Regions:
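Conserved beta-strand hairpin/beta-sheet module of binuclear metal-dependent hydrolase folds
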Residues: 2-60, 151-154, 158-162, 255
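Metallo-beta-lactamase
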Residues: 2-5, 49, 99-222
Length: 323
């Protein structure tokens, strides 16, 4: 799939994984995105999950059309994006890997059997790599959401390769609302690092961005202001929904009745949106996502073994871990 005349999408869809990172339900699957930039020099941007090595390498080969890649750019070392580095280098051994210092430290630990002597290009923050007519500038984005992360800006095509930023759950062959699954992805995975995301958004504001190419989810070409605004809201912990979320746990139904009574009273008083959540039955990631969206949060819980009920304790731990 063409992103632009010179940029080809070579990612894959994953309908095998049911829990992303062992905890986030993904009923509509996932996408692991990767890109080929064709120019006088050819660059491949990131790899995909190891389960899809053959499909991805086939996609890369088709995009290359018989040419050889000059560079493999690694923006993020999480295994769903880095696992095929070694497989790629076995197929294309003359490729130079482009990454930053922290990435190469991780790479040496992840792939101890891989000899990269003479096949690396270590870049600094703000450094530019020319492919010919395409100039790629590397912007470090530490803790968005790993310490080595960087993003890549193509000033020729006005494309931002945003690593995990602006990603979402869901495979790219499934139609679904971007906001809901991008919010759940952001709050769950990146939500702890709002300050770092804000720093990256400030840099992005200085760039002329017409296309955003994330490592998960769809390529964003239209209404970019909407997506950037959402990231600004989420990363600044601003109120997205005017209303109240009531999160409760209940053993014999009494706390549930209290929560429902409060919800009814709030609605009578004109509260624009009341969301009641039974934490024992809700998807915890969805509950945490909603807690960050609403301006007001009410917690109602019974005790259990002389302590807070377990599901409420887990919920509070999720909130404090991301604050």
């Amino acid at each position: 799939m063409k992103v632009t005349n010179d940029i080809i999408y070579v990612g894959v869809n994953d309908h095998q994984t049911d829990l992303f990172e062992g905890q986030y339900a993904v009923p509509n699957g996932l996408a692991y995105n990767s890109y080929v930039i064709r120019d006088e020099k050819v660059a491949v941007v990131d790899t995909v999950d190891v389960k899809f090595a053959h499909e991805w390498l086939d996609n890369v080969g088709a995009a290359l059309g018989g040419t050889k890649p000059d560079y493999l750019i690694i923006q993020h070392m999480e295994p769903d994006h880095s696992a095929n580095i070694y497989n790629f280098m076995k197929v294309y051994p003359d490729t130079t890997i482009v990454a930053n210092e922290k990435t190469f430290v991780m790479m040496a630990n992840f792939f101890r059997e891989m000899d990269l002597e003479g096949r690396t290009l270590e870049v600094e923050n703000g450094q530019t790599l020319s492919l010919g007519k395409h100039d790629l500038t590397f912007v470090f984005a530490p803790m968005v959401h790993w310490p080595e992360v960087m993003v890549t800006y193509d000033s020729t095509e006005k494309v931002l390769f945003s690593a995990d930023g602006f990603g979402k759950f869901g495979a790219n062959d499934v139609e679904e609302d971007w906001d809901d699954e991008a919010r759940r992805y952001y709050i769950g995975i990146v939500g702890k690092y709002g300050t770092q995301v804000q720093n990256l958004l400030k840099v992005a504001a200085t760039l002329d961005i017409q296309v955003i190419c994330p490592l998960h989810g769809p390529i964003l070409k239209e209404n970019l202001g909407h997506y950037i605004e959402k990231y600004d809201i989420w990363s600044s912990y601003a109120v997205e929904k005017e209303g109240v979320m009531i999160a409760y746990t209940s053993v014999y139904g009494n706390t549930k009745k209290a929560a429902e009574t409060l919800a009814a009273k709030l609605e009578e008083k004109g509260c624009p949106d009341v969301y009641v959540c039974d934490l024992a039955r809700a998807d915890m990631a969805r509950a945490v996502e909603n807690a960050f969206s609403y301006g007001k949060l009410v917690l109602a819980t019974t005790t259990y073994n002389a302590d807070i009920f377990p599901f409420m304790k887990i919920f509070i731990e999720h909130l404090t871990a991301r604050n």
